């Protein structure tokens, strides 16, 4: 049964993309994304968004989207490795932000195209009549914060 958004009130659906589209139920302690699986931006498709909208939701709060410290090796894409001694698990904590100008490469089907995939998700969400909310907590940073995608002239 849909929730009624009466008198213009927002109804927010919090969504963690790394879990949303993941159909792997292994849940191995300290497991890799290959062992435990990971959801992708593209898993949040028009069918899913339409179903969420039909529940009466007005906004989707995408959590864990900004690039955070993790232990997957993305150095071939210019993303530096994180120190295993300070990362929470292999997948990391979405609140240990490592680059406020980038998105989590685990959530992309193509790491070099991760920002475009995220932008397509935002467009898809809006096309389905929903608004987007993104977590942004400036003091929740990884111990090794260093942007590899910041705009020219911006200092870390």
What positions do the PLM features span?
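N-terminal structural segment of carbohydrate-active enzymes
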Residues: 1-131, 139-156
